[in-house]
């Protein structure tokens, strides 16, 4: 299967094929009877049983924090008495189905899955009446969780003593939580996470006591950290020790009690002088793209790794610094903590789910195709240009970031402004106060928005961003998205144009709209029964 339809494939018929796991077998249904290669040396017989399809649309749900869902109504006839099979115990509800596209001459392994899921609310009648249902594919709709480890002080103490470096002393009987640490919370300048005092042991070589604090429930890249007592702000810089406890690699801070400059604290806060989690694919996990890829790997979703890796590269400028100290539902965390902060939407493609990265700074040179209605009369506008999101305009945005567990508050803020008067009173560009580091960022599109619509304010909080450069990137893409209303319009094209996919950039020349190479984003692609495709285009404003 190619990543895109080729012109050779699009010059022939694109067939729809429904495969259904039911009653102990696999059924293959199309809109005509054909026999194809299965890709392994055998053949597959596709029966003429796919009666009707509707809403064959691939949509990129841009800037949505909801999980993507694709639902396709289908009507089919298996050629058998379904009512009798149901009474024999073969339940239609919930059986797995795949609707795929197949080009002339391709074998089954080259098909392009359009939707894979279970039949929802199927309807059936007598023999010959067929079955009606919807195939629904949900992404990140499960309750899979990111789990943090709970460590008993006695287990950690035993593991340390087993190394021969330490001897028994005292330790609490309570358990402690070993958090997940991503990147450098606090950006290496302020406290970014919490540690937990676990035990005190003697160093065998010196006979002197050392205190041990659990930093993370995994190996980290940092070799030293700074601990601080949140009550009196005394600090100490300690080495980081990796020790395995019950099969879990823990990162532990080792405090020399004879030289420490910190007064004892059961839960000190941590300033990270290096990175956190080491990604299993290599390197320190510290960018938004790497973080999203990591979270997707924790799910049971089929992931398009090729497109996910491309997204990782596109998001290198967005650094992540955060920690989790309680189990969290992955889907909820992605929706609530990540998707509002980075220019990403989750999308579903033939190879699985992937993060689509919106190119907010794209230009006409990034377009993959040019629609010119004056040169190609087969390209036709379908309907009127529509304004959207006029009620969601924001041109003055306050971003609170760099969560500090010591103060239990955000340590920094940055403003995106189009009008200097919309800045907080009494503060200058780049100024600061005793409680928050404040700075400002602007874009001409914000000034345009203020001039047209007046000041529209919003405050956004994020616990996953710790550095100012990433904060500026967040303001940049959100300003380009929400400062102005967005316009959408549909164009219908012959099938030969169907290689263009949702997420692509195109330019449009249409004298009726006074457009000359207007840059647009392809939001959706709909396949019509006559072989044409309809594209919904979103104008990139600004």
List the predicted regions and their residue ranges.
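Surface-exposed interaction regions enriched in Ser/Thr/Asp/Glu
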Residues: 228-302
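C-terminal extracytoplasmic interaction modules
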Residues: 1-111, 123-133, 138-221, 272, ...
């Amino acid at each position: 299967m190619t990543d895109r339809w080729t012109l050779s494939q699009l010059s022939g018929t694109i067939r729809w094929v429904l495969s259904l796991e039911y009653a102990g077998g696999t059924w293959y249904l199309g809109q005509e009877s054909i026999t194809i290669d299965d890709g392994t040396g055998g053949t597959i017989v596709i029966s003429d049983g796919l009666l009707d399809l509707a809403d064959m649309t691939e949509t990129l749900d841009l800037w949505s924090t909801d999980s993507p869902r694709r639902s396709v109504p289908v009507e089919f006839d298996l050629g058998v008495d379904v009512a009798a099979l149901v009474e024999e115990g073969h339940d239609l509800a919930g059986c797995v189905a795949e609707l795929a596209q197949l080009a002339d001459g391709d074998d089954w392994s080259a098909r392009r899955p359009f939707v894979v899921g279970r039949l929802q609310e199927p309807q059936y009648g007598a023999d010959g009446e067929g079955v009606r249902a919807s195939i629904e594919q949900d992404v990140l709709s499960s309750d899979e969780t990111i789990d943090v480890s709970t460590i008993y002080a006695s287990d950690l103490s035993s593991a340390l003593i087993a190394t021969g470096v330490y001897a028994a002393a005292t330790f609490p009987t309570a358990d402690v939580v070993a958090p997940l640490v991503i990147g450098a919370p606090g950006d290496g300048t302020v406290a970014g996470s919490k540690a937990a005092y676990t035990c005190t042991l003697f160093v065998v070589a010196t006979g002197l006591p050392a205190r041990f604090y659990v930093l993370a429930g995994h190996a980290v890249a940092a070799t030293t950290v700074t601990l601080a007592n949140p009550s009196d702000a005394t600090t100490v810089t300690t080495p980081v020790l990796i020790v395995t406890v019950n099969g879990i690699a823990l990162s532990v801070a080792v405090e020399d009690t004879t030289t420490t400059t910190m007064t004892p604290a059961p839960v000190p806060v941590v300033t990270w002088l290096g990175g956190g989690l080491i990604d299993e694919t290599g390197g320190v996990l510290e960018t938004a793209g790497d973080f999203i890829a990591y979270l997707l790997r924790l799910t049971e979703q089929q992931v398009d790794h090729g497109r996910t890796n491309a997204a990782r590269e596109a998001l290198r400028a967005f650094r992540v610094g955060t920690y989790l100290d309680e189990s969290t539902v992955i889907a909820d965390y992605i929706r609530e903590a990540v998707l509002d902060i980075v220019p990403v939407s989750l999308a579903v493609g033939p190879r699985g789910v992937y993060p689509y990265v919106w190119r907010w700074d794209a230009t006409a040179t990034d377009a993959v195709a040019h629609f010119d209605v004056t040169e190609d009369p087969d390209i036709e506008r379908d309907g009127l240009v529509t304004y959207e999101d006029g009620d969601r305009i924001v041109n003055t945005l306050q971003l609170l970031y760099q969560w500090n567990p010591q103060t239990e508050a955000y340590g920094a803020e940055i403003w995106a402004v189009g009008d200097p008067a919309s800045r907080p009173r009494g503060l200058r560009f780049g100024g600061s106060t005793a409680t928050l580091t404040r700075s400002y960022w602007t874009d001409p599109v914000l000034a345009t928005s203020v001039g047209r619509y007046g000041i529209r304010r919003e405050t956004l909080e994020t616990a996953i961003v710790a550095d100012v450069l990433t904060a500026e990137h967040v303001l940049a893409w959100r300003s380009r998205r929400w400062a102005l209303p967005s316009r959408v319009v549909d164009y219908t094209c012959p099938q030969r144009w169907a290689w263009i996919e949702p997420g692509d950039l195109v330019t449009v020349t249409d004298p009726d709209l006074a457009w000359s190479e207007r840059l647009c984003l392809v939001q959706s692609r709909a396949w019509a029964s006559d072989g044409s495709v309809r594209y919904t285009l979103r104008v990139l404003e600004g």
